[in-house]
Design a protein with these regions (language model features):
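Membrane-interface extramembranous regions
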Residues: 1-83, 90-153
Length: 153
């Protein structure tokens, strides 16, 4: 009879196990880090109109953002995204730390998605045509959770 408990590691790890974890970590971190880093670097060039758009979108999920100056918000967002992207690409930053950072970042994106009725269908879950661009960011939460759950090296 199949026993799923036999699939759980017993704590003894081999060099191959550590290599596999390194590959899994890199496969999660590199494309995500490059994507977020590129997005953050692009926001440093945001003009006033773009900064106001970014602030308005963020304020739909996090109302306290309205109190900030739009251009300062855009710079803060650019810095945060660039920092998170860079941290994902630096192998000495622990998986758990970057995973938690990614979960927080994804939470901010998803708060905009769920707070804006135009982003979802009438059921409040499935994305509308307008909401697809934000709903797809749910994969960031999954990657963050996977990184946070990886065992220490």
């Amino acid at each position: 009879m199949f026993n799923p408990l036999k699939l759980i590691p017993t704590g003894v790890s081999t060099k191959q196990d550590k290599t596999d974890l390194g590959f899994a970590s890199a496969a999660l971190r590199v494309p995500t880090g490059l994507f977020i880093l590129n997005s953050g670097l692009g926001k440093f060039k945001a003009d006033k109109q773009t900064a106001e758009f970014l602030q308005g979108m963020a304020a739909s999920g996090m109302p306290f953002v309205k109190e900030m100056d739009a251009e300062n918000f855009a710079k803060l967002l650019a810095t945060a995204e660039t920092g998170l992207g860079a941290a994902l690409l630096l192998p000495f930053v622990p998986n758990r730390l970057v995973g938690l950072g990614l979960i927080g970042f994804s939470g901010g994106l998803l708060s905009m998605y769920f707070a804006n009725d135009a982003m979802t269908e009438s059921d409040g879950i499935r994305p509308s045509q307008d909401g697809t661009s934000l709903a797809k960011d749910s994969w960031l939460a999954g990657i963050g959770a996977a990184l946070a759950a990886l065992p220490k090296k």
